[in-house]
Amino acid sequence: MPQSLTLLPQRVLAVAVVITALALAALITLATGQPYVGLTLAIDQDRVVVLGSTAGLDVAPGTEVRGLRSGGTELPLAPVDLTPEPDMAFVRYSDMDAFFERQRARSALLRSGEAWLQLADGRELSLPVTQSRPLRDLPFVFWFQLFCAAGGLLAGASVLAFRWQDPSTRYYALTGTGMLLFAGAASVYSTRELALDGRLFMALSSINEFGALLFC
């Protein structure tokens, strides 16, 4: 057997490992590079409520949130704004575009460095905004999706490396690539804290959709 063919499995696996490592590093960088306030929100029927705060805010769990403010800019916060997967929440493209625009506005407000949390009881709490999210704050779901993304690509590459002439293994490797794309993209936007830049969110959502098509 020619030496080039003998070395093919090692080459395929090496390339797959490098691609996976670079992709994971990029996703972690994106996830931690967002404004952070140490606040966990949740949906309670038709309300947005506080679950907890790691920043020592004087707010009890279950307190209803109305929105964010910075200077003269006030941005209301609705339950739909917390949806982890916009593709499942909106039917019309115009609604999704409006969602991305609200994300952009909130992200810009938080990046301004001064933000206030508006509560339904009329109080406003100053948010201690930092421009990066601590690695320890990333939830289990984020890491699980990264595990799925990496596992998909490496599993596909492992089969392709040893049976690269079989068309079915090439298709299997393609589905693994799709898993890397859709699970990796979703890991960033589905576990965001308060907001993600709208353009980045839109790009990640498109990558997620493309990856899902490859996977199917």
What are these regions (language model features)?
Residues 1-35:
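Interdomain regulatory linker/hinge segments that flank or connect interaction modules
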Residues 68-115:
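PDZ domains, with a preference for the canonical peptide-binding region formed by the helix
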Residues 137-159, 163-216:
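Individual alpha-helical transmembrane segments in multi-pass integral membrane proteins
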Residues 46, 113-115, 123-125:
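Envelope-exposed proteins and targeting segments
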Residues 30-81:
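PDZ/PDZ-like domain segments forming the peptide/carboxylate-binding groove
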Residues 62-65, 115-117, 164:
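Terminal peptide-recognition signature
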Residues 118-143:
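Short, aromatic-rich amphipathic segments at membrane interfaces
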